[in-house]
């Protein structure tokens, strides 16, 4: 009985060892940092001598699979791999080092003339930030047996400004035109023939696959957001009591936001590609108009509590909405006109907005020009809104103090509380919108850092869901819901102009106290 038990335990141990040997991943070594060293000389201590490099036994393993770019495993013949990239910098090739690539296909046995014509040097950015020019074969380990990144690849010609790239010592690859960092499984290098006028040259060129992010999440959020915007606009148009000056400005803001996001969605679905530039400029116009309407709201709130002479205030109230329209739409037209002009006459790519560039029907947000034409005005308007809301808050405190020292304070206190609620809701709107766009600006500055770019992805989702947030804040609140029910029953059709009243009351209060 004891002998049988020992035999069973031995069998289990043997099976475990066999399985472990079959899938002998090298400890703390990425598969894409290994090479096949089966043909290398094996020494008595278990280490291998590979291309003049001593690979210790602890950095070797027997594999009967290979890992594909999607992390799945493919069964292959058993072979020995070594984690040589921990010992010496590696360069990831698509095919063996003496092959040349043409239209994504590797061709073997380069001729002596082609080998003589080949430029064998690569610029490698070291860990300390310096750039070293290295011979691909003599100073680096060539990894050529890794699976191809994808079926269809495109190459980069670093003679072109838009095709610049950076190859790092640890094997990562940074593509400049879309500021994307690629791992070894997502790109490879190979010799390629380039035309140089009437002559040709052979150089090492990177071949990689575009990282196409899933648009499902963005699509769902943006469609939901657009639906909520339509519902919000409909409620404010249906309920007469909401159509005071605040409400009219808010409706204009929502219309601009809806149109801006609609053009973003059309760009996301590539629907606007047939009228790309006009779609890009129209989308830009409505987004900037939305920002100007948000500044109108903050300015109007401040003016509501500021107070002025009775006649002047009455005159301004009757014509203020026209003035606000002239300002918001006019400034958006001016900025859009400047952007259109710059897009057509500015030759320097760093100063050109490049609307419709790289297949996106929007202003090009990967370059410094985006700060000049898009994020710069955005920062200025956010700063203006912050200033207005702070000044309004100070004025509310001042009016509250005045009311405490004035007769009939209960009636005026009710009006103040009503406008304080209006201020609070619009302040909440600005905080949500200002925060989301501020994070968007942070996302713009962090594009070169993939880690921070992933963090700021939260800002993108917050931005895309603005319509949902506004619907919750402005329509699903109890007071709006009550007004909607009254309007459905045909009650209370009078427009609420309390913002004018509080301004006039505050002015009278101030004059009496003086």
Swiss-Prot record:
Other information: Agonists of mth share minimal sequence homology, suggesting a remarkable promiscuity of mth for activation.
Signal peptide as annotated in the record: 1-24
Phenotype for residue 407 to V: In strain: ZIM(H)23
Residues listed as glycosylation sites in the UniProt record: 45, 109, 123, 170, 198, 449
Outcome recorded upon mutating residue 387 to N: In strain: ZIM(S)35
Single GO molecular function: peptide binding
Assembly: Homodimer.
Residue intervals on the Extracellular side: 25-218, 270-278, 342-370, 446-454
Location in or out of the cell: Cell membrane
Pfam families in UniProt: 7tm_2 (PF00002), Methuselah_N (PF06652)
Function text: Involved in biological aging and stress response. Essential for adult survival. Required in the presynaptic motor neuron to up-regulate neurotransmitter exocytosis at larval glutamatergic neuromuscular junctions (NMJs). Regulates a step associated with docking and clustering of vesicles at release sites. SP/Acp70A and sun are agonists that activate mth in vitro.
Membrane topology per record: Multi-pass membrane protein
SUPFAM superfamilies per record: Family A G protein-coupled receptor-like, Methuselah ectodomain
GO cellular component: a single term: membrane
PANTHER family in the record: G-PROTEIN COUPLED RECEPTOR MTH-RELATED
Organism: Drosophila melanogaster (Fruit fly)
Disulfide bond entries: 29-83, 85-90, 94-188, 95-106, 150-209
Keywords, comma-separated and alphabetical: Cell membrane, Disulfide bond, Exocytosis, G-protein coupled receptor, Glycoprotein, Membrane, Neurotransmitter transport, Receptor, Signal, Transducer, Transmembrane, Transmembrane helix, Transport
Topological domains, Cytoplasmic: 240-248, 300-320, 392-424, 476-514
Disruption phenotype: Increase in average life-span and enhanced resistance to various forms of stress, including starvation, high temperature and dietary paraquat, a free-radical generator.
InterPro entries, alphabetized: GPCR_2-like_7TM, GPCR_2_secretin-like, Methusela_ecto_dom_1, Methusela_ecto_dom_2, Methuselah_N_dom, Methuselah_N_sf, Mth_GPCR
Ranges annotated as spanning the membrane: 219-239, 249-269, 279-299, 321-341, 371-391, 425-445, 455-475
Name this polypeptide is given: G-protein coupled receptor Mth
């Amino acid at each position: 009985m004891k002998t049988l038990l020992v035999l069973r335990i031995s069998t289990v141990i043997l099976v475990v060892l066999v399985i472990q040997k079959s899938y002998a991943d090298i400890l703390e070594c990425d598969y894409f940092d290994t090479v096949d060293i089966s043909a290398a000389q094996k020494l008595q201590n278990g280490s291998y001598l590979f291309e003049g490099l001593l690979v210790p036994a602890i950095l070797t393993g027997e594999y009967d699979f290979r890992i594909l770019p999607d992390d799945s495993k493919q069964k292959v013949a058993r072979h020995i791999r070594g984690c040589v990239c921990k010992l010496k910098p590696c360069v990831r090739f698509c095919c063996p080092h003496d092959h040349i690539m043409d239209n994504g296909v590797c061709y073997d046995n380069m001729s002596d003339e082609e080998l003589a014509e080949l430029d064998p040097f690569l610029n490698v950015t070291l860990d300390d930030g310096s750039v070293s020019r290295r011979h691909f074969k003599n100073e680096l380990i060539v990894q050529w047996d890794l699976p191809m990144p994808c079926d269809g690849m495109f190459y980069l010609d670093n003679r072109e400004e838009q095709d610049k790239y950076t190859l790092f010592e640890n094997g990562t690859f940074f593509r400049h035109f879309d500021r994307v960092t690629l791992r070894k499984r997502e790109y490879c290098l190979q010799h390629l023939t380039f035309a140089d006028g009437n002559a040709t040259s052979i150089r090492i060129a990177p071949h990689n696959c575009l990282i196409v992010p899933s648009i499902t999440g963005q699509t769902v959020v943006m469609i939901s957001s657009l639906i909520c915007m339509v519902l919000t606009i409909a409620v404010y148009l249906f309920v007469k009591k909401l159509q005071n000056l605040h409400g009219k400005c808010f409706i204009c803001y929502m219309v601009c936001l809806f149109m801006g996001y609609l053009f973003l969605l059309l760009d996301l679905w590539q629907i606007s590609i047939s009228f790309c530039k006009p779609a890009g400029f129209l989308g830009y116009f409505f987004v900037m108009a939305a920002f100007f309407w948000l500044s109108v709201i903050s300015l109007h709130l401040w003016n509501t509590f500021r107070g002025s002479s009775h006649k002047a205030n009455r005159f301004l109230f009757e014509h203020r909405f026209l003035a606000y329209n002239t300002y918001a739409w006019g400034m958006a037209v001016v900025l859009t006109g400047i952007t259109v002009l710059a897009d057509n006459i500015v030759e320097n790519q760093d100063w050109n907005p490049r609307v419709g560039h790289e297949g996106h029907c929007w202003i090009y947000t990967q370059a410094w020009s985006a700060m000049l034409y898009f994020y710069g005005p955005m920062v200025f308007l956010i700063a203006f809104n912050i200033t207005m809301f702070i000044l309004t808050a100070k004025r509310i405190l001042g009016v509250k103090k005045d009311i405490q020292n004035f007769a009939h304070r209960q009636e005026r206190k009710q009006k103040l509380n009503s406008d304080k609620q209006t201020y609070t809701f619009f302040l909440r709107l600005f905080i949500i919108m200002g925060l989301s766009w501020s994070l968007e600006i942070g996302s713009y500055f962090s594009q070169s850092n993939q880690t921070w770019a992933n963090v700021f992805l939260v800002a993108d989702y917050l931005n895309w869901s603005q319509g949902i947030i506004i619907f919750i804040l402005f329509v699903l609140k109890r007071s709006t819901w009550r007004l909607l029910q009254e309007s459905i029953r045909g009650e209370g059709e009078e427009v609420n102009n309390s913002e004018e009243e509080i301004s006039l009351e505050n002015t009278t209060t101030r004059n009496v106290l003086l």
